[in-house]
Swiss-Prot record:
GO cellular component, one term: protein-containing complex
The protein, known as: RNA-binding protein 4B
Residue stretches making up the RRM domain: 2-72, 78-148
Subunit structure: Interacts with TNPO3, which may mediate nuclear import of the protein.
Pfam families, sorted: RRM_1, zf-CCHC
Function noted in UniProt: Required for the translational activation of PER1 mRNA in response to circadian clock. Binds directly to the 3'-UTR of the PER1 mRNA.
Matching SUPFAM superfamilies: RNA-binding domain, RBD (SSF54928)
A molecular function GO annotation: zinc ion binding
Coiled-coil region: none
Zinc finger (CCHC-type): 160-177
Organism: Homo sapiens
UniProt cross-references to SMART domains, sorted A to Z: RRM (SM00360), ZnF_C2HC (SM00343)
Record keywords: Activator, Metal-binding, mRNA processing, mRNA splicing, Nucleus, Repeat, RNA-binding, Zinc, Zinc-finger
Length: 359
């Protein structure tokens, strides 16, 4: 189908009169008159050329009419993609090759392929049939309709046919849909037109940026502040306390082998210190009590070296050792009031020293 433009029509001309005039050269598909011009669609290209040749400047009702091919805006169907082009081929040579099939509006070579814009769709179809898979300058080129939506019209084009969303009325660079199919953010354009949005006020100490933030911002003051001397001393004491408990819990329990009934068990030392009882210190307390009972016998015995040597001599048939025979009598021990019988000396010195040395 070829569209013809008819200009300078007289007011007396009608559609039926124009249709009958062009049907002399071929089948007319459509005829429209708009004021003093009109359009005629002829099915055959040869018939359209004959009509242009014979009816151009034809006198109708005393007025010479103009008949020529319609120069409509090129559409996407007239854009051809030409692949596998020789590197020595130029735009003029490629244009001349396609002009054999019809008028060429634009021809652009990009590396080894090119885009050719033909004026009429019929000419583009004929060029595809005649030039596809043919030899041109030593290479077999491929010609087909272009499927690209970018610059469907020759030149810079207009705001129609956005190649991103397919809608009209805006440039492709201003399309609200980005390449991923999502609506683009127009924050930058808004800031350029109306100014940037004011940033929120600076938050004070302890405030959170988000309401109900489970984690919040890190408080460097609480983490890295210098702790007081009391806090450091308390931490060291707690650590030493735990160390003493672990050390004393491994000491074996000592069984008392002496008679300590002569000691005064009711004496109370107001300066005596005891650790708080816990699960790990039960065995330690029992061991310390047994050691204190054993040590008290040392301070309650006779200090005379002569009497002690005579009392400790072994009997016949017996070896050296300690037993009930080697001990002083309870009566002699009870009659003597030694300064060493005080309750504050009833504990083992070395055990207490190891116990409180960590402090």
């Amino acid at each position: 189908m070829v569209k013809l433009f008819i200009g300078n029509l007289p007011r007396e001309a009608t559609e039926q009169e124009i249709r009958s005039l062009f049907e002399q050269y071929g089948k007319v598909l459509e005829c429209d008159i708009i004021k003093n011009y009109g359009f005629v669609h002829i099915e055959d290209k040869t018939a359209a050329e004959d009509a242009i040749r014979n009816l151009h400047h034809y006198k109708l009702h005393g007025v010479n009419i103009n008949v020529e091919a319609s120069k409509n805006k090129s559409k996407a169907s007239t854009k051809l993609h030409v692949g596998n082009i020789s590197p020595t081929c130029t735009n003029q040579e490629l244009r001349a090759k396609f002009e054999e099939y019809g008028p060429v509006i634009e021809c652009d070579i990009v590396k080894d392929y090119a885009f050719v814009h033909m004026e009429r769709a019929e000419d583009a179809v004929e060029a595809i049939r005649g030039l596809d898979n043919t030899e041109f300058q030593g290479k077999r080129m491929h010609v087909q309709l272009s499927t690209s939506r970018l610059r469907t019209a020759p030149g810079m084009g207009d705001q129609s046919g956005c190649y991103r969303c397919g809608k009209e009325g805006h440039w492709s660079k201003e399309c609200p849909v980005d390449r991923t199919g999502r609506v683009a953010d127009f924050t930058e354009q808004y800031n350029e037109q109306y100014g940037a949005v004011r940033t929120p006020y600076t938050m004070g100490y302890g405030e959170s940026m988000y309401y109900n933030d489970a984690y919040g911002a890190l408080d460097y003051y609480k983490r890295y502040r210098v702790r007081s001397y009391e806090a450091v001393a308390a931490a060291a004491a707690a650590s030493a306390y735990n160390y003493a408990e672990q050390t004393m819990s491994h000491l074996p329990q000592v069984q008392s082998t002496t008679v300590t009934s002569h000691l005064n068990s009711t004496s109370v030392d107001p300066y005596d210190r005891h650790l708080l009882p816990n699960s790990g210190a039960a065995a330690t307390s029992a061991a310390m009590a047994a050691a204190a009972a054993t040590t008290s016998s040392y301070y309650g015995r006779d200090r005379s070296p002569l009497r002690r040597a005579a009392a400790m001599l072994p009997t016949v048939g017996e070896g050296y050792g300690y037993g009930p025979e080697s001990e002083l009598s309870q009566a002699s021990a009870a009659t003597r009031n030694s300064l060493y019988d005080m309750a504050r000396y009833e504990r083992e010195q070395y055990v207490d020293r190891a116990r409180y040395s960590a402090f």
